[in-house]
Amino acid sequence: MKILYISPENTVGTLNLWKHIHEKNGHNCRFITFFPSPKKYGDDICLNLPFDFTKKRLANWRHQFYKIYRGRTGYYTEKKGYPPVWTPEGKIDKLFFIMKDVTWKRKVEKSIDNFDLLNFDVYHFESGMDFFKDSSFAQKIKKRGKKIICHYHGEDLRTRGVMPELDAVSDLNLTSEVDLLGKHPNINYLFLPFDTDSFTTKQKLNNPVRVCHAPTNRYYKGSAAIIAICKKLVSDGIIVFDLIENLPHKEALNRKLEGDIFIDQIGDKGGWGYGMNSVESLSMGICTLTMLNETYQNFIPDHPFVNVDETNLENKLLFLINNPEQIKIHGNKGKEWVVQKHHYTNVGKKLYEYYQKDGIVN
């Protein structure tokens, strides 16, 4: 079987792992991305297209522009609907996407021919996104009897919505975000895959304790409050604080490895619970703090996280610092849990269960 992943970019390295998982199962797998990996993960087929809205300047421009249509919260405004459905916000928005598709068309069609992209058996559309806004590629392969999977990661479904033509032909919908389970009538949960064996468990704590935070989006993570609280503890001589941002992935990992406590997020603005940042820190055996609402706690009742929010973060940090054995206990529990839930072998087995259940494979 030949499997193709189509994605805006290789954001957190999972495309490499999916390729590895499928090849271990005896299948051929490739992935094609619109833009280069921002954190220098390896790319397979990269189109290097224009209009990369994952870049900060363009993302901010889009956010400010969408305030015209959505109000103060701009692009971050969650769309309503079950599922939410993408439509252009207005005439300017519509004209832009027409122009973008025209600009992309020649390079995309050349790549379809050069890499024989019409002759795969299974197609994963990461972020539920085709090359084109009308999902013409997905419709073409569906007519050829191909199987289509859409995997949603957060913002794509919360603030953009499903692409209606692609959603209509999808055989299987997946997400690794618990809140998205309530935003689509036909979607399944899958833990993020990770090579949890990449790191040995941390044994020795720093003195003073080293606290890390590595936001990809400060607004989503509640970083302003996290940074303010940690800077206060630094000024009191209680901790060392490492803010890890805008670095190649390898360098960011090396910085995280030096930490004793990792803070993921303290709000639900950009998705609930935790993401790849926490998966990495748990795999390192690092005590990991994040906000888990009641729904998320019920979804993973055996979780290893220290549950925090803006009102209790400082006190919980002080408790851990004054009880360093608790830092180690949470770190060791986290390592065991992340192997069980996120090791790529276990996640791959679950994906193939969905494949069989939904008739993707016999």
Sequence positions of predicted segments:
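Short hydrophobic beta-strand element within catalytic cores of glycosyltransferases
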Residues: S281-T290
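N-terminal subdomain of nucleotide-sugar transferases
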Residues: M1-L47
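Conserved donor-binding/catalytic core segment of Leloir-type glycosyltransferases
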Residues: L4, T201-K221, I227
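Donor nucleotide-sugar binding/catalytic pocket of nucleotide-sugar-dependent glycosyltransferases
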Residues: I149, D156-L157, D167-T201
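A charged, aromatic-enriched C-terminal amphipathic alpha-helix characteristic of glycosyltransferases
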Residues: E325-Q356
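Active-site proximal beta-strand in glycosyltransferases
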Residues: V122-G128, A138-L157, N173-T175
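Short N-terminal targeting/anchoring amphipathic segment
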Residues: K2-S7, F96-K100, D113-F132
